[in-house]
């Protein structure tokens, strides 16, 4: 039987996500710690991966205890269980920087969702290596930063980008069809905090002209993949994928239009899950508590 969760106006709704080596008693230890602080768990999911020996957990909890006190308890628990963990407010808008080149379908979708509160993101800026999408960003009242990239200026451009990330207190970078490869050093610096949308159902059709490749192969499904960015091009841990039907009569342009619809959907879902702390890294894979 469904029931409402009792809480006061002063209660904080927090989300705890964690990973650690798997062993007996983790769930009991975590929930016990929350219960001793008067926490009321509203959502809980966990997963033990026998192939890696790691345990993953996500808990939403209502509590009137000051957050700093709860964090102190969790830090002690983390030391005992070798946990990597984070604690945040449920629904808090994550400070996000979007990077683009010339195609605007993903940017427009993300900005609309952010403005209409359809995504828990605070878009603090848009970076483009071309000026093409400045008008789109400014239409939504978001500052646009033009950082051109050439082979000769790549290092300086990435230094400028990192300065922007630091000055704006950016928590998440989204590559919304940004057509430049990030250096290994930049990938390492922003590890786990950069999401890319790839215009195919990885690992198929990597590189340029994916829809032309798909057309040449006569595929019956086309898709898109959102993944974390690593130094290995298009090989980062996958967060979300989806597909749509393709017909023998579809031209390259029709396939591209269908694919762009999927790209928008997949990227928005990946961003949502990341900002809601539903995605945990598991080596080269992810655990997604959808």
What are these regions (language model features)?
Residues 40, 84, 122, 143-145, ...:
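Conserved beta-strand segments of alpha/beta enzyme cores
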Residues 105-115:
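Histidine-anchored nucleotide/phosphate-binding helix
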Residues 121-132:
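Short internal beta-strands
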């Amino acid at each position: 039987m469904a029931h409402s969760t009792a809480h006061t106006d002063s209660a904080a709704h927090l989300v705890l996500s964690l990973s650690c080596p798997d062993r007996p008693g983790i769930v009991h230890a975590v929930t016990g710690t929350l219960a001793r602080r008067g926490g009321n768990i509203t959502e809980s999911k966990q997963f033990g991966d026998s192939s890696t020996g790691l345990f993953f957990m996500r808990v939403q909890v209502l509590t009137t205890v000051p957050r700093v006190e709860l964090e102190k308890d969790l830090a002690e628990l983390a030391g005992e269980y070798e946990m990597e963990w984070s604690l945040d407010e449920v629904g808090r808008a994550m400070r996000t920087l979007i990077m683009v080149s010339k195609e605007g379908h993903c940017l427009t979708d993300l900005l609309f969702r952010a403005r209409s509160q359809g995504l828990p993101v605070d878009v603090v800026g848009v970076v483009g290596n071309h000026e093409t999408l400045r008008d789109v960003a400014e239409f939504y009242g978001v500052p646009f930063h033009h950082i051109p990239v050439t082979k000769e200026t790549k290092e300086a451009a990435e230094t400028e980008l990192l300065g922007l990330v630091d000055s704006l207190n950016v928590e998440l970078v989204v590559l919304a069809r940004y057509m430049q490869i990030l250096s290994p050093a930049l990938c390492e610096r922003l590890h786990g905090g950069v999401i890319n949308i790839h215009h195919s159902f990885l690992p198929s059709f990597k590189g340029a002209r994916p829809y032309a490749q798909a057309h040449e192969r006569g595929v019956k499904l086309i898709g898109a993949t959102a993944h974390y960015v690593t130094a290995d091009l298009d090989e980062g841990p996958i967060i979300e994928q989806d597909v749509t039907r393709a017909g023998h009569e579809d031209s390259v342009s029709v396939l591209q239009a269908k694919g762009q619809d999927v790209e928008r959907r997949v990227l928005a879902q990946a961003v949502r899950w990341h900002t809601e702390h539903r995605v945990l890294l598991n080596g080269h894979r992810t655990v997604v508590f959808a």
